[in-house]
């Protein structure tokens, strides 16, 4: 698809299939002034001595420089298309006025809970907790893209004088193309591609509707409330022990967490989930399969992600389950998939948004997304004393579905469960995380010591007489590169690594 000029300096380009799916999901809760799958990332920052003066001005300038580097940050959705305006220094300044915020009072959790659907991304600086919070709609970017984007942002802070200060006269060439275009998917489908796509999506949806989940509050007409998350982070020594145990058994950390999640659903899930096998939708990174240069960091600002639906059999033991999952992780990729992306997303949208009677029980499946070692995409330490001490990623959930994220940062494994407060209490989420931890300890013969449990702000106020969570106050020790061994989060495809990409029940 090409850009078409509608007015002088204004260009419009239709959303492609994958973008259209994400955009429709973005608009699905707009009548409630809410956003499903809104992406967020929280960074707790030690700015070092060089950024102690005029910090707000420096952050704002770096945010503008990031916009110049990634003009996709300025795109605005219009119907089922994206709009680009030719920019100059003044328009970039206006964009910053619409997207950069400083709040001296709010916690990161309060920013996320109160976020509304916006046509542009946002960056918040919260001086009370020394936090930077990035928010974006999912049609614009994915999880690993967010990590690479933030790495570029902190690289700008590291050397602000080296960044171009004004946008190019026409930036369309720097705007990352759709997934289908980046993958080189033909615009005209053959009969073989149509057949492959139809069978692929039929099989995907057949498995996806079987996803298992946990009992939820309320009835079928209960409206969503605030998005929330509970998380547990394990010490570097515990993370090392878990990695070593997985390596000894020749399984990945992702497979171990996946199997532990399945066992947790078998024990704590809905009654029908306890009796059935466990199927979940799991995101995979498609960036390694894209054509150059779209497989590079220069194209962080786009959604290049797919999904698989591995199954865990209830009748198997833990090691058998992990072995089966490893096979699923290694065998999912098919070159035909990349070629057939356009009909795949067409059939997927048809199935996803078709008018039908609501199911008797609203879906409440749990999704697993492993981001792996964050430092592969986003450094923790920069020059001049600039450090990202803590990283947290998530999405805003508006349905009864939950999402489990796993990643390591500074050598510490984090498990984070995203949910909506209308359907789950924080105590339920903690119970789920605790059960996953216990399964891992039992099956891998390790002891996992939580560094800190991330508590809701209100409970933290009560326990510590402060409104900031412990996770944003603790500073972990620096971990050697050797500790960064979360290779288990890498899903080896048939030829290239495919990393779980941090999305919900995604389009593939």
UniProtKB/Swiss-Prot annotation:
Enzyme Commission number(s) of this protein: 2.3.1.-
InterPro entries in alphabetical order: CAT-like_dom_sf, PapA_C
Region (Disordered): 166-188
Use in biotech settings: As colorants, MonAzPs are widely used in various food products for centuries. Moreover, MonAzPs also possess wide-ranging biological activities such as antibacterial activity, preventing hypertension, lowering cholesterol levels, causing hypolipidemic effects, and displaying antiobesity and antitumor activities.
Keywords: Acyltransferase, Pigment, Transferase
Root EC class: transferase
Pfam family membership, one: PapA_C
MF (Gene Ontology): acyltransferase activity; pigment binding
Disruption phenotype: Produces the angular tricyclic shunt intermediates monasfluol A and monasfluol B that retain the omega-1 alcohol.
Domain of life: Eukaryota
Keyword Acyltransferase annotated: yes
Matching SUPFAM superfamilies: CoA-dependent acyltransferases
Known role: O-acetyltransferase; part of the gene cluster that mediates the biosynthesis of azaphilone pigments (MonAzPs), a complex mixture of compounds with a common azaphilone skeleton very widely used as food colorants. PigM and pigO are involved in the elimination of the omega-1 alcohol with pigM acting as an O-acetyltransferase that synthesizes the O-11 acetyl intermediate whereas pigO eliminates acetic acid to yield an intermediate with a C10(11) double bond.
Protein's UniProt name: O-acetyltransferase pigM
Organism: Monascus ruber
Gene from which the chain derives: pigM
């Amino acid at each position: 698809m090409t850009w078409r000029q509608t007015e002088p300096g204004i260009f419009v380009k239709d959303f492609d299939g994958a973008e259209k799916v994400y955009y429709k999901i973005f608009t699905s809760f707009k009548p409630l002034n809410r956003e499903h799958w809104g992406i967020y990332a929280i960074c707790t920052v030690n700015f070092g001595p060089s950024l102690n003066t005029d910090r707000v001005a420096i952050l704002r300038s770096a945010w503008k420089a990031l916009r110049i580097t990634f003009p996709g940050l300025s795109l605005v959705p219009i119907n089922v298309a994206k709009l680009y305006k030719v920019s100059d220094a003044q328009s970039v300044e206006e964009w910053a006025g619409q997207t950069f915020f400083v709040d001296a009072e709010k916690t990161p959790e309060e920013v996320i809970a109160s976020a509304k659907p916006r046509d542009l991304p946002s960056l918040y600086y919260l001086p009370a907790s020394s936090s930077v919070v990035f928010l974006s709609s999912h049609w614009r970017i994915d999880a690993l893209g967010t990590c690479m984007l933030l790495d570029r942002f902190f690289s700008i802070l590291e050397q602000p004088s080296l960044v171009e200060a004004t946008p190019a006269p026409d930036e369309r060439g720097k705007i990352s193309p759709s997934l289908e275009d980046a993958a080189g998917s033909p615009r005209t489908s053959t009969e073989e591609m149509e057949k492959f796509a139809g069978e692929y999506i039929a099989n995907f949806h057949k498995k996806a509707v079987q996803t298992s989940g946990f009992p939820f509050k309320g009835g079928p007409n209960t409206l969503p409330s605030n998005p929330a998350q509970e998380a547990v982070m394990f010490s570097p020594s515990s993370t090392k022990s878990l990695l070593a145990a997985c390596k000894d058994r020749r399984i990945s950390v992702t497979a171990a967490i996946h199997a532990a999640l399945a066992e947790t659903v078998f024990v704590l899930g809905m009654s029908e989930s306890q009796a059935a096998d466990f199927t979940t939708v799991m995101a995979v990174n498609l960036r390694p399969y894209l054509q150059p240069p779209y497989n590079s960091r220069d194209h962080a600002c786009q959604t290049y992600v797919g999904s698989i639906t591995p199954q865990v059999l209830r009748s198997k033991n833990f090691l058998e389950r992990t072995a089966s999952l490893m096979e699923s992780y290694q065998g999912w990729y098919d070159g035909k998939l990349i070629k057939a992306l356009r009909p795949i997303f067409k059939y997927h949208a048809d199935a996803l948004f078709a008018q039908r009677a609501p199911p008797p029980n609203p879906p409440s499946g749990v999704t697993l997304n492993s981001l792996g070692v964050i430092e592969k995409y986003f450094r923790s330490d920069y020059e001049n004393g600039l450090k990202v001490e803590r990283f947290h990623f998530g999405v805003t959930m508006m349905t009864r579905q939950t999402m489990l994220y796993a990643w390591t940062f500074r050598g510490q494994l984090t498990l984070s469960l995203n949910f909506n407060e209308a359907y789950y209490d924080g105590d339920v989420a903690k119970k789920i995380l605790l059960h996953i931890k216990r399964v891992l300890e039992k099956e891998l013969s390790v002891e996992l010591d939580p560094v800190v449990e991330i508590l809701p702000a209100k409970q933290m106020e009560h326990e510590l007489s402060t409104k900031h969570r412990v996770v944003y106050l603790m500073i972990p020790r620096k971990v050697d590169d050797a500790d960064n061994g979360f290779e288990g989060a890498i899903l080896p495809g048939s030829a290239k690594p495919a990393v779980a990409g941090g999305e919900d029940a995604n389009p593939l």
